[in-house]
Amino acid sequence: MKANDIKKGNVVEYNGGIYQIRDIERSSPQGRGGNVRFRFIMYSVPGGAKLDASFDADDNLPEVELLRRQSTYSYKDGEAFVFMDDEDYTPYMLDAEVIGTDAGYITDGLTGIFVQVIDDQPVAVQLPQTVTLEVVETPPELKGGTATKRPKPAKLNTGLEIMVPEYITNGERVLVNTTTGEFAGRAD
């Protein structure tokens, strides 16, 4: 696939690795006879290591077929996380090192997960934009401090720690943005 045909989300092979394109910058310098250059910000699959590379418009990058299978988190088997395909109930096992920091957002029965599969092998997961987690430990609200919105630390049921508004109490369910790791509101 030529560099000028690549779109965000495409999965390509580069330098012996497999990468997913996350961002594209196009530049056409005036002094080079109109040769358009593309700068790709891509992340390795699996692993998520960031790579920044530039290509000419006619550079060729082989495209890799990546399937995204909607799945539900099932259980943890030793150090591996097991996800169940929502359509055909295929179990996908991914090691804790592949899941990485996303493990802090995964709870029993979590739905809306996409397992990324290359050649029938699960290589990565894509979590929903927000997940609902329970606050298990946070300091009480300070009386008289309502004029300022000071955040306070809160430990969640998965072990994750985030900053929450003062009015959040122990036992409350909160929405957490899986991209930024920040408080996104109260859960219903």
Curated annotation (Swiss-Prot):
MF-aspect GO terms: translation elongation factor activity
Entry's Gene Ontology cellular component terms: cytoplasm
Matches recorded under CDD domains: S1_EF-P_repeat_1, S1_EF-P_repeat_2
Disulfide bridge map: none
Top-rank taxon, per record: Bacteria
SMART domains: EFP, Elong-fact-P_C
SUPFAM superfamilies hit by this protein: Nucleic acid-binding proteins, Translation proteins SH3-like domain
Swiss-Prot/TrEMBL GO biological process terms: peptide biosynthetic process
Family: Belongs to the elongation factor P family.
HAMAP family hit by this protein: EFP (MF_00646)
NCBIfam families (UniProt xref): PRK00529.1 (NF001810), PRK04542.1 (NF003392), yeiP (TIGR02178)
Protein name: Elongation factor P-like protein
Organism: Xanthomonas campestris pv. campestris (strain ATCC 33913 / DSM 3586 / NCPPB 528 / LMG 568 / P 25)
